[in-house]
Design a protein with these regions (language model features):
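Generic early N-terminus positional signal peaking at residue ~5-7
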Residues: 5-6, 56
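C-terminal segment of classical bacterial N-terminal signal peptides
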Residues: 20-28
Length: 345
């Protein structure tokens, strides 16, 4: 069986049977006999935050789940068996919550994920006193519950989420909804790992850009003959983090004064570079570079228009996460002397 054992199948079937009875007769029971109300007895108010003005109108059924902590019947939601590539966001405020690559079939009839977008989901004690509720960190919308120790995936975590609490942005529409930035600062493994921890960063991918070779391979780039740099593509939620904050962070996790190298990694492929997608990004990068020069730094960072971004081989993606280690080559250094409100903490 893929990604889950017989125990999870049996558990999921048990959960569905009890759920069906509960929907007709009262409280719902899900996992280990825990019960929770379906009648809205514990309302969940919207939290005031920067996104309050973007709250979307809800249908009565969505309000029952999102505001009043209700639960949709199993196998009824539109996303329980949905595996199209893309991003799942909060139905109420639109904040990015989950990546499609972290979705799996838990056999329970609700969308299940084994990881969330950094900082996007908040855990809190459920009113039943036993389980852990998960809510959108942006607006407080009820999502569902999180379970650990079920051994369904290597991460050993399952976010059990109501479809009614979610919306979906397909891969083809990501650029219409979210921001995209591309940075190069030496070995892309460490830069990738650093950006993955930034709240508001939805997804990172490592690859090659800035050169002339079509569909380059890692050995070709390492030879220094392609003109490409090892780079990181950052997909980010502009409701949470700004491009300016990401660029500041970039300048603080590598040494922008080194030319065509970072530490022991030497060559054009390890250069410091920002690849801007539009004039707004270009202006932000130029402004930050001037601030650093005003502080006496001899900035060597290349500023180039973004061309084709060639994804690196699969074994380079999420390198340190797959190893279960933290990079030793990346250390943040304060370079700007201030920390504005939209800065990465």
């Amino acid at each position: 069986m893929s990604r889950r054992g017989l125990g999870s199948v049996v558990g999921g079937l048990w959960c569905v049977i009890v759920m069906g009875v509960a929907l007709m007769n009262g409280p719902i029971s899900c996992r280990n006999g825990v019960t929770f109300p379906t009648d809205g007895s514990k309302d969940l108010p919207a939290e005031r935050n920067a996104m309050t003005n973007t709250m979307k109108p809800l249908t009565p059924e969505e309000e029952r789940v999102i505001v009043h902590r209700g639960t949709e019947p199993p196998f009824s939601g539109r996303f329980w068996n949905h595996f199209e590539p893309g991003i799942y966001g909060c139905r109420r405020c639109g904040r990015a919550l989950y990546r499609s690559e972290n979705k799996f079939d838990a056999g329970c009839g609700w969308p299940s994920f084994d990881a969330e977008v950094t900082g996007a989901v908040r855990r809190q004690p459920d009113p039943d006193g036993r389980r852990t509720e998960i809510v959108c960190a942006g607006c407080g919308a009820h999502l569902g519950h999180v379970f650990e120790g079920e051994r369904m995936t290597p991460r050993n975590v399952r976010h059990c989420v109501n479809s009614l609490s979610l919306e979906f942005v397909p891969e083809s529409a990501l650029d219409l909804r979210f921001g995209r930035a591309v940075f190069a600062g030496g070995c892309f493994w460490g830069v990738d790992a650093a950006f993955q921890k930034v709240p508001g960063v939805i997804r990172t991918r490592v690859g090659y850009t800035g050169g002339g070779t079509t569909n380059p391979t890692y050995p070709e780039v390492c030879r220094g003959t392609t003109g490409h740099a090892e780079a990181v593509e950052v997909l980010y939620d502009e409701q949470v983090v700004s491009y300016d904050a990401l660029a500041r962070f970039f300048f603080e996790i590598h040494d922008p004064t080194q030319y065509h190298r970072q530490g022991p990694d030497i060559g054009e492929q390890y250069r410091s570079a920002i690849f801007y997608a539009n004039e707004t990004q270009k202006a932000a990068a130029e402004r930050l570079m001037e601030q650093l020069r005003a502080k006496g730094l001899d900035v060597k960072t290349d500023l180039q228009p973004l061309g084709p971004f060639w994804l690196a081989e699969a074994y380079h993606q999420n390198y340190y996460e797959r190893l279960g280690k933290n990079p030793s080559c990346v250390r943040r250094v304060s370079r700007f002397g201030d920390r504005p409100n939209d800065s990465v903490p």
